[in-house]
Amino acid sequence: MTPLRIVVGADDAGYAYKEALKADLAADARVVEVVDVGVGADATTPYPDVAHAAAEMVADGRADRALLVCGTGLGMAIAANKVPGIRAVTAHDSFSVERSVLSNNAQVLALGQRVVGLELARRLVREWLGYEFDPASASAAKVALIDELDRRGADSGAQAGPTTTTTTCGS
């Protein structure tokens, strides 16, 4: 596995975990670079700005993955997913972390400081670093479909999807 370039970010609700996880990442031999996009100890930058900055670094190739922390991890994942080409997930258990990479090729992991303990967060990040998506896997075609939906949305501004039919029940 090629050493990873990781970008980290948090809002004020995830600052303490971000700092601990950033130190763990910097000490991990699988990581060659850690870039912190905020927040600082006394900052209150809104999480969408932090998530967007981190996701942009992944999308444009300046980082391989991003680790984001807020209160729940949910807002960070939602905001990061607004960047074309990004697949961000919130995961608070080992199986979800594993499948996020192996099945979905997610490049962004969002954690919630108010949801999991620090030692579990540390374990999940260590596990996350060990997974690498296999472009020849059975999941590759599904990930390619996700990428195609992303491109179609970016190109046309319209949502693509299946045809739907509405039926009214009763009279």
Task: Give, region by region, the residue ranges found by the protein language model.
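A short beta-strand-loop structural module common to alpha/beta enzyme folds
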Residues: 32-44
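Helix-adjacent hinge/juxtasegments
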Residues: 50-91
